[in-house]
């Protein structure tokens, strides 16, 4: 099984994080992750995209260091790395989560 790579907190790059946050769908996923402990592609039913597209967006969030994945059987459970983001970029996540959706 392929174990996903999660960047260490000390290696998070602001440009990668901001790039990941530059997409409205990924912003919605980050908001959902902030409200829930974990999410899977199937629990994001309100997001109207193909499962493969959703998986791609979760991959971008994971590779940027915003999200982490836990694999259990065939399921991938995604969660927000809020503490790591706060440590690396204080206030960034809070600022992003407080922006009204009409300003995305």
UniProtKB/Swiss-Prot annotation:
SMART domains: HTH_ARSR
Gene Ontology biological-process annotations: regulation of DNA-templated transcription
Organism for this UniProt entry: Bacillus subtilis (strain 168)
DNA-binding region: 40-63
Protein name (record): Uncharacterized HTH-type transcriptional regulator YczG
Pfam families: HTH_5
One GO MF term: DNA-binding transcription factor activity
Keyword Magnesium: no
């Amino acid at each position: 099984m392929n174990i996903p790579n999660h960047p260490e907190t000390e290696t998070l790059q602001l440009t990668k994080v901001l790039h990941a946050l530059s997409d409205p769908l990924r912003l919605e996923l980050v908001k959902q992750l902030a409200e829930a402990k974990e999410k899977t592609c199937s629990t994001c039913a309100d997001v109207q995209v193909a499962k493969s597209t959703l998986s791609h967006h979760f991959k971008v969030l994971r590779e940027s260091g915003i999200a982490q994945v836990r694999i259990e059987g065939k399921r991938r459970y995604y969660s927000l790395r809020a503490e790591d983001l706060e440590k690396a970029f204080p206030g960034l996540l809070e600022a992003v989560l407080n922006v009204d959706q009409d300003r995305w």
